[in-house]
Amino acid sequence: MTEPTWTRERLQRLVLREVGDYRIIVVSNRQPYIHELVEGQLQYAFPSGGLTTAIDPLMQECGGTWVAYGGGKGDRYAVDEKNRIMVPPDDPAYTLRLVWLTEQEEQGYYYGFSNAALWPLSHNAFIEPVFEQTDWETYQSVNQEFARQVIDEIDGRPAAVFIQDYHLALLPRMLREADPDVIIGQFWHIPWPNYEIFRICPWQDELLNGLLGNDMLGFHIGDHCDNFMEAASRILGSRVHQEYSLVYHRSEPTLVRPFPISVDFDQIDADARSSEVTDEMGRLTDEMDLGGKLVGLGIDRIDYTKGIPHRIRAIGRFLEFHPEYIGRMVFIQAGVMSRININAYQQLAEQIETLLEEVNGRFGTDNWQPIIYIPTDLPNVTLMALRRLARFCVVSSLHDGMNLVAKEYVASRFDEDGVLILSPFTGAAHELTEALIVNPYAVEQFAEAIYHAAVMPAEERRDRMAAMRAVVQENNIYKWAARSLVDMMQVGRRARRPIRSF
């Protein structure tokens, strides 16, 4: 394969050129390094995920500050009197500043407004949002606390603040009012709903006003940008300049652009080739009795947006239509439970268990069952081995901003084998057009897509996978970080002209 356009080293060179004298401050709910107490000893973990993969090297190069909620049990023991600690632990390069929340604040801000209101509001999964006044008030106060800490960190110096996601929608306006000269950008990692859905939110004006405090606001795809700009126009009366993707609110422009997030292709590709993964493939094949069988895979956080019940039904229909695969195929559904104190997630877990019992009970035998369910947090080497073993991987999201599972599967298949079955309701479907695109609500079509993956000739599998790998390699996580940084810095310096693209 060809060399990728963007690498970690090129991103670091870009940082030096673009940032100049500005202090870079990243703000997110989730922290890049978590400190835990293990048998009285302080240990740290580096959470996996696209956000930390992209921004950690950027921060290591520019030496700024990352402000985040401190949720680790050892975090308070690791920081100094100003709640700061230098990271990474083995080669300190930038400052991590932690924000403390009470249990009540975490409940109202995170589990309440962020994930019981904004999350279902933003995803077309037909889960009714829960809008509680007390949750909204807590969300405001927590955003204000983040603003206070960021302003303290800026301390009157030139600064550029890069905010992450839906937990901090009010923060940009708070920062803009506190320091009009600061450069502010934000990336919204989930979909933005259409106008008719968004306007059910009782605090629609406040959310839009908060986000329009940004110089730059990024989404995964153009449709979400369009939805946001329509909401700003129709709800706030903001002026929208479609050609240049600018929204003018209070005569202040905000650039609204798509920046499709991705993965570290080269790192995943290298990990997939390791002897540890090869050994793990052998262990899993023996342990799960996968030898000679058609293996399918789903890797998801257990969330109602991921369409897990829909794929279980489709597997049942596949076996009904094609009984010759009974005893000859295994579908492995891996994923970790999340947000279990929210009713919708508890109901989802019960629904999944019921459907698994139905399908496995109907088609299973004494020594075989079609679906193996692993609702635990698996180590990376095991996940990588599962990707390598799977003839097909299913991403059946009902609505997803991007979905990196699809790109991780593609990046891991250096053998250029495997079939990706992908929902059209993901951002990834806009890029990975050689996947088998199937509507998860259409159970018969879904079942036939599984059959198509099962019988697809090796040459077609290779052609499709090679094309998708080229897309993911070129549009990797470092390209996302580079485009986001350049556009934020350029528009933040009041360069009111079309921003160049890479």
Where is each model-derived feature located?
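Catalytic cores of carbohydrate-active enzymes across secretory and cytosolic contexts
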Residues: 1-502
